[in-house]
C-alpha cells in the first residue's frame, strides 16, 4: 500500500509542476494589459473602478496660477455619460491613493499597480513647466511616497499634453534628487498626450534627456470616433529596433468592438470608463490566449517582446 501511495504522490507532484510550468509559459507569452480607469478624480472612485476590473487609473491634475498642483479636476466638457465635476484637493487625493496602494493598509487594493496623472498644464505659461515639475515632485514625495518611508507602491506616469512643457520632467527629477530620493524615479514614467507626430514626440524626449520609461498615448473623447492610424505608428515605433516607445495605450474605449480593435493593434493599455467591458473582452476565447491583466510583477517600463 505504501509504495502505491508514494507512486500516486509522485505522479501528482510531476503533474502539478507541469501544470505550473504550463501556466507560467502561457503567462509569459501573453501580453500584459493595463486597464486604465478614466477620470478617477474622487477618492471614492478608486475602489469603484478597481472593483470593476481596473488595475490602473487616470487622474486629472489642475494647477493654480503659481504652478502648484491644486485639484484632481477635469471640468466641462468631458466624456459623454460622465460627471465632469468630481474632484479632491490634490494632496488629499494623494493620501487616499497612498492608502489604496500601500500593502498592509486597510484600504489596500492589490490590483492597483499604475497611476497616470493627466497634468492639465494648459493653464500654465511655458516658462512655468519646470517649476510645476518641482512642485509636483514635492507633493508626491510628501503625500504619496511618505518621504520614502513605506509610501504607495504604484508606478506613476506623468502625462503632459504640450510638447513645449518637457522641462516639467527635468524639474520633477531635479526636485527628487535635491530632496534625497532620486531612486523614486525608477517608479516614474512619461507620456505626451497631445496626439502629436511621433517624430516630434521623440524630439521632445531628446530635449528632456529622457530614454526609457516611455508610454505613448493616443485617443479622443468617447463622444467622437477616431481611427487607429496613429496607434499603429506608435506600436511600430515600440516594436522597431531603434524605437523610443516602451508601451502604447489608447483612450477612451468604452465599446467591446473598439476594445477588440485596440487589442488587435497590439496596445499595452486601454483607458476606459467601463473597466468591466475591457475585462469581458480579455476573457473571450480569442483574446485570453494572447492577453492577460497586468500585475505588480509586470514592469510597465519594459517593452513586451512578441
From Swiss-Prot:
Binds 1 Mg(2+) ion per subunit. Expressed by the venom gland. Keywords: Cytolysis, Dermonecrotic toxin, Disulfide bond, Hemolysis, Lipid degradation, Lipid metabolism, Lyase, Magnesium, Metal-binding, Secreted, Signal, Toxin, Zymogen. Gene3D superfamilies: Phosphatidylinositol (PI) phosphodiesterase (3.20.20.190). Its EC number is 4.6.1.-. Mg(2+) binds at residues 58, 60, 118. Disulfide bonds join 78-84, 80-223. The keyword rRNA-binding does not apply. One of its GO terms (biological process) is killing of cells of another organism. GO terms for molecular function: lyase activity; metal ion binding; phosphoric diester hydrolase activity; toxin activity. It catalyses: an N-(acyl)-sphingosylphosphocholine = an N-(acyl)-sphingosyl-1,3-cyclic phosphate + choline; an N-(acyl)-sphingosylphosphoethanolamine = an N-(acyl)-sphingosyl-1,3-cyclic phosphate + ethanolamine; a 1-acyl-sn-glycero-3-phosphocholine = a 1-acyl-sn-glycero-2,3-cyclic phosphate + choline; a 1-acyl-sn-glycero-3-phosphoethanolamine = a 1-acyl-sn-glycero-2,3-cyclic phosphate + ethanolamine. Its cofactor is Mg(2+). Pfam families: GDPD_2 (PF13653). Residues 1-18 form the signal peptide. Residues 19-26 form a propeptide. GO terms for cellular component: extracellular region. It is an enzyme of class 4 (lyase). Dermonecrotic toxins cleave the phosphodiester linkage between the phosphate and headgroup of certain phospholipids (sphingolipid and lysolipid substrates), forming an alcohol (often choline) and a cyclic phosphate. This toxin acts on sphingomyelin (SM). The level of enzymatic activity is high according to Tambourgi and colleagues or low according to Felicori and colleagues. It may also act on ceramide phosphoethanolamine (CPE), lysophosphatidylcholine (LPC) and lysophosphatidylethanolamine (LPE), but not on lysophosphatidylserine (LPS), and lysophosphatidylglycerol (LPG). This is Dermonecrotic toxin LiSicTox-alphaIA1bi.
Amino acid at each position: 500500500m505504501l509504495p502505491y501511495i508514494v507512486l500516486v504522490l509522485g505522479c501528482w507532484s510531476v503533474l502539478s509542476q507541469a501544470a505550473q510550468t504550463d501556466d507560467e509559459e502561457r503567462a509569459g507569452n501573453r501580453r500584459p494589459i493595463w486597464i486604465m480607469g478614466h477620470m478617477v478624480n474622487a477618492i471614492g472612485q478608486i475602489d469603484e473602478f478597481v472593483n470593476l476590473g481596473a488595475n490602473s487609473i487616470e487622474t486629472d491634475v489642475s494647477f493654480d496660477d503659481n504652478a502648484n498642483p491644486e485639484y484632481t479636476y477635469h471640468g466641462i466638457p468631458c466624456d459623454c455619460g460622465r460627471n465632469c465635476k468630481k474632484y479632491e484637493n490634490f494632496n488629499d487625493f494623494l493620501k487616499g491613493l497612498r492608502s489604496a496602494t500601500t500593502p498592509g493598509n486597510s484600504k489596500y487594493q492589490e490590483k492597483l499597480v499604475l497611476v497616470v496623472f493627466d497634468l492639465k498644464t494648459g493653464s500654465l505659461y511655458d516658462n512655468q513647466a519646470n517649476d510645476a515639475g518641482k512642485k509636483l515632485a514635492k507633493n508626491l514625495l510628501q503625500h504619496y511616497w511618505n518621504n520614502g518611508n513605506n509610501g504607495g507602491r504604484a508606478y506613476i506616469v506623468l502625462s503632459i499634453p504640450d510638447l513645449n512643457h518637457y522641462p516639467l520632467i527635468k524639474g520633477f527629477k531635479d526636485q527628487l534628487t535635491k530632496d534625497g530620493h532620486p531612486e523614486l524615479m525608477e517608479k516614474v514614467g512619461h507620456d505626451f498626450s497631445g496626439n502629436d507626430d511621433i517624430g516630434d514626440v521623440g524630439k521632445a524626449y531628446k530635449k528632456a534627456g529622457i530614454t526609457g520609461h516611455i508610454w505613448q498615448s493616443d485617443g479622443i473623447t468617447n463622444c467622437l470616433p477616431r481611427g487607429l492610424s496613429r496607434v499603429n505608428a506608435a506600436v511600430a515605433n515600440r516594436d522597431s529596433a531603434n524605437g523610443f516607445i516602451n508601451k502604447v495605450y489608447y483612450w477612451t474605449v468604452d465599446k467591446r468592438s473598439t476594445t477588440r480593435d485596440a487589442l488587435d493593434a497590439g496596445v499595452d493599455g486601454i483607458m476606459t470608463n467601463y473597466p468591466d467591458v475591457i475585462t469581458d473582452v480579455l476573457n473571450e476565447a480569442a483574446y485570453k490566449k494572447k492577453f492577460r491583466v497586468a500585475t505588480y510583477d509586470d514592469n510597465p517600463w519594459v517593452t513586451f517582446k512578441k
